[in-house]
Amino acid sequence: MDDQNRRTRREFLTHAAGAAAAIASLGEAVLASQTPAGATGLPMRVLGRTGERVSILCLGGWHIGSVKDPTEAIGIMHAAIDEGLTFFDNCWDYHDGGAEEIMGRALADGHRNKVFLMTKNCERDYQGSMRCLDDSLRRLRTDRIDLWQFHEIIYDNDPDW
């Protein structure tokens, strides 16, 4: 770099701080325009190209399955729904299906229609995947999954996607 283009440390920091402030304020404006709050104030966002609006926070089944008292876990999920959390994530693999079972109990009695429900499949063939889906539907006590995705494509025998 020649001397004409060299900046002092003070100039660099001044410009960097100004750029950071501009980016931060732009980020807030973009975030505010794309995440209008639901009735409870929790910001919502369109999920990819699905057109579905979900809360920007997601309740994860792994952690719900870790709660020792099922009544407490169900209470946590009901409180989350009451506060506007609409995105629930799970997988049959979480606690050997226990996380899906407890989430299924929590989503009974009309709560299912208040959430966007996602679960995952670890099988790599059609028959195994359909069996996994049927088992998840049974454990979650529902007739539909809003988003079903492959989990952990990391193994030696995974298809070359």
Question: Each PLM stretch: what is its role?
Answer:
Residues 2-20:
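N-terminal secretory signal peptides and thylakoid transit peptides that target proteins
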Residues 27-57:
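C-terminal segment of N-terminal export signals and the immediately downstream linker at the start
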Residues 47, 59, 88, 103, ...:
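Conserved, mostly hydrophobic/aromatic
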Residues 48-51, 104-112, 136-142:
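Acidic (Asp/Glu)-rich catalytic clusters
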Residues 52-56, 85-86, 111-115, 142-146:
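Short, well-ordered coil/turn segments that N-cap beta-strands
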Residues 60-70, 119-127:
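Active-site mouth loops of central-metabolism enzymes
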Residues 90-106:
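Glycine-rich, proline-tolerant flexible connector loops at the mouths of alpha/beta enzymes
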Residues 124-161:
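Glycine/proline-rich, positively charged
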